[in-house]
């Protein structure tokens, strides 16, 4: 039984709709076996965690909380490593504290991690020197090396992806439930980069205020800030591979409906969000909060006829926290597109949480052919989004970043002024470029007050 209005929804009803960006597995029998095995494994998250997140997202939609979502474009199996995971949790916790201070709102922290292993690709195949092979679709599908064996979509990797997700979440749960409290104390942060910025004095002042606030609160309550917020960390990934998502979707005792228990908060990518497609069909029947990416491929005058059926399918009951729209228009287009999106949603009479992903509309390729993004474009899209929402009697309720806690060089700009020529020093992403530790922290410092002014 589902709470969804459609009586014909089932865990397999998506199979009757066009499913875009699914790998073509040559061995169908192995796929069936892998999916059957997956369906028997324990879930990675619980329905009560999912419900708790949904109710917090509902409060964010009302302007009472703020969402920080971030992590890799695509996690790699080899990144399932204590340092990589710790660094990512650390930057997200630190950014969240900066945002709490600036916005004066509780911040919901959601990692793009513990399952962000599948990628939609613009082309199903890649050709090099006359050799055509399947594209790399993320580690849960195939391997990046350009040879026949590596690019072969292997259904058993679905199980390897589930296992990596479980290992990651197990470690995260241990970290957030104790021993990580120090990260809330700005005196332990890596702030060497600050002095490279013309805004150094301003940043130092903000960090000092933060430090004082943390100490004040701990003195007042006798509880460490780390302990106060210890359970508030959730996971998300793009709900792309429907074989995987449906195998981990379960009905649970004493609750109505179906929960996708591979993650707390799946989102539907821009390329798979057609209202009559398989992805919307599948996610219309599950109880999790759902994100949908909205990009500039539709013109402003077309957005209404897209949004109406989308919201009817995914958000028929106007349940608080159910639907998040993650707009990713790019700094150059957001002013043209966002007002129309806000109006189109308003016309449906439903409430959604609006989040800005300032990464995916700002991708560019350098002269040397490297995919990158400018720090200032990312900031500009965020600033414009905050302003446009405010002017439209709406509000930006969260931010969605591609970032890492490591010292990579994938995006240009920031306090150290990374240039296109610096990108070769530490470019590790196999897909989209991420903000590094310093750039991510600086971004949080820059946007916190602007969001706060509005709140
Ligand atoms: C992503 O989030 O990595 C992604 C592919 O985004 P979008 O669907 O918005 O292009
Ligand atoms: Co990406």
Residue ranges with predicted function:
Residues 66-71, 108:
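Short, hydrophobic/glycine-enriched beta-strand segments
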Residues 74-75, 80-330, 373, 381, ...:
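Active-site-facing alpha/beta catalytic cores
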Residues 294-295, 358-362:
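Conserved phosphate/anionic-ligand binding catalytic regions in large, soluble enzymes, centered on
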Residues 303-314, 322-353, 360-409:
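Non-transmembrane, aqueous-exposed alpha-helical and coiled segments at domain scale
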Residues 413-416:
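C-terminal structured domain segments
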């Amino acid at each position: 039984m589902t709470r969804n209005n459609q009586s014909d929804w089932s865990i397999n009803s998506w199979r009757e709709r066009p499913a875009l960006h699914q790998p073509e597995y040559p061995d169908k029998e192995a796929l069936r076996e892998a999916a059957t095995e997956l369906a028997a494994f324990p879930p990675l998250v619980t329905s009560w965690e999912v419900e708790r997140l949904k109710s917090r997202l509902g409060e964010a939609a009302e302007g009472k909380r703020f969402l920080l979502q971030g992590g890799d474009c695509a996690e790699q199996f080899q990144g399932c490593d204590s340092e990589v995971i710790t660094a990512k949790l650390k930057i997200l916790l630190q950014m969240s504290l900066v945002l709490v201070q600036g916005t004066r709102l509780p911040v919901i922290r959601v990692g793009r991690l513990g399952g962000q292993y599948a990628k939609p690709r613009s082309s199903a195949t890649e050709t090099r020197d006359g050799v055509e092979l399947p594209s790399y679709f993320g580690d849960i599908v195939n391997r990046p090396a350009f040879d026949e064996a590596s690019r072969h979509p292997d259904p058993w990797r679905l199980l390897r992806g589930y296992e990596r997700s479980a290992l990651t979440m197990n470690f995260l749960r241990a970290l957030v439930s104790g021993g990580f409290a120090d990260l809330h104390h700005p005196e332990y942060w890596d702030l060497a980069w600050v002095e490279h910025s013309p805004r150094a004095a301003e940043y130092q002042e903000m960090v000092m205020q933060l430090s004082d606030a943390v100490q004040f609160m701990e003195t007042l309550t006798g509880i460490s800030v780390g302990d106060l917020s210890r359970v508030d960390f959730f996971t998300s990934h793009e709900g792309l591979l429907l074989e995987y998502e449906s195998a981990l979707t379960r009905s649970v005792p004493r609750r109505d409906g179906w929960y996708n228990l591979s993650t707390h908060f799946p989102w539907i990518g821009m390329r798979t969000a057609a209202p009559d497609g398989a992805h919307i069909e599948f996610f219309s029947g599950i109880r999790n909060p759902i994100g949908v990416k909205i990009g500039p491929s539709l013109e402003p005058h077309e957005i209404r006829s897209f949004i109406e059926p989308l919201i009817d399918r995914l958000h028929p009951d106007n349940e608080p926290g159910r639907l998040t729209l993650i707009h990713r228009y790019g700094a150059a287009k957001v002013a043209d597109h966002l007002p129309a999106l806000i109006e189109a949603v308003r016309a449906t009479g439903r409430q959604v949480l609006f989040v800005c992903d300032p990464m995916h509309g700002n991708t560019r390729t350098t002269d040397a052919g490297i995919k990158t993004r400018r720090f200032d474009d990312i900031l500009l899209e965020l600033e414009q989004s905050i302003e446009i929402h405010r002017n439209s009697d709406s509000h930006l309720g969260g931010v969605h970043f591609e970032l890492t806690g490591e010292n990579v060089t994938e995006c240009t700009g920031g306090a150290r002024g990374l240039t296109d020529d610096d990108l070769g020093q530490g470019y590790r992403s196999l897909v989209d470029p991420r903000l590094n530790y310093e750039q991510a922290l600086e971004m949080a410092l820059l946007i916190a007050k602007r969001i706060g002014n509005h709140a």
